[in-house]
Amino acid sequence: GAVLPKSLTIKVIPQFDEMATPNIEDNLFYSAIKIMPASFSDATKKDLTAKYTAMINEKLIPQYKKMAAFLKTDYLPASRATSGIGSLPFGQKLYAAYVKQWTTTAMTPDEIHELGLNEVARLNGEMEKVKNQVGFEGTLLEFFEYVRNKPELKPFKKPEEVIANFEKIYSVIKPNVDKLFSLQPKTKFEIRRTEAFRENTASAEYNQGAADGSRPGVFYVPIPDVKEYNMYGDEDLFLHEAIPGHHFQISLQQENKSLPDFRKYNWFGAYGEGWALYTESLGKELGLYKDPYQYFGMLGNEMHRAIRLVVDTGLHSKGWTREQAIKYSLENEAESEASITTEIERYMAIPGQALSYKIGQLKIMQLRQKAQEKMGKKFDIKKFHEKVLESGVMPLALLESKIDAWIAEK
């Protein structure tokens, strides 16, 4: 049958054990009791607490214990030693279907793997240039380590200073956004520190606002240890998660009254993540990346997405092992081994999803280049961005048809 790789099953078991913790106040399902509104009467609070406690103890914990026991005694011994789904009897066909679903293209795993290798080589060359520019003598791998630990890139003493730095980035790009975008969202935007209860495990992320404007879009930044916070990728991160990345794209889609609801709230990762990754390349046009370390941060994030093309296809169509994928990543990017291991296991668990970012970015960049070449002096970057954003997410083939039609009109 189709079972998870052993290395993933091992990671799942403690999660079920945690959900079955006998210490009721530490149980996730008890959290609602801790945040009951002050307006509730003492009697109501007492009644709800008793009912929640009984439900958790009598219904939920026994089921989680049962599931954890099944995973340990039955599922783990039957889990597979291979890392990718290509090893399953129907795995190659299944992976090809996932690739089509996540990239919204007809590209094959072999084509994507080759594209990834070429992009990794190109970006390695760009990273070497930055390394030489700052006068670092040593290998690129040594430079990765140097950047990760450089004290000047960890200047913050208070979490508020991290948020203030993002506000500063926002103030730098604000005057330049109008030069690239005529179509901009009305939804308000805020930068906030990630809430304490999830900060230790969260990534920086964008949380979309309400379509009616009642709630702003929020860029959340986790700062679990401010003294260890490295700022070298912050300019790039802001463009991707906030403006003009996810905040622009998602807000414009939700605000678009001409779209039916199923399209206002729809999502195609190749388009949505492709757009966010494309906006990282706009940094210089928006007044950023003047510091070589910030530019290196952009290259590092793009490299991370290029590596995904290689390792995802390697794992699921070429028989790569988990260890092989980790080794390839460690040799080509500045992430820690712990972070890379988590990423590789994510690719093992969700085949094809990690391909969407880079495939989408490259398609949008290719369409921009095509429009510039065919339209010449008639090309208007603001109009190009409007055409890409105005109809919301869609498969990349449809986006290409839309841009081709716009080019033909001119």
Placement of each model-derived feature along the sequence:
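N-terminal maturation segment of proteins
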Residues: G1-K410
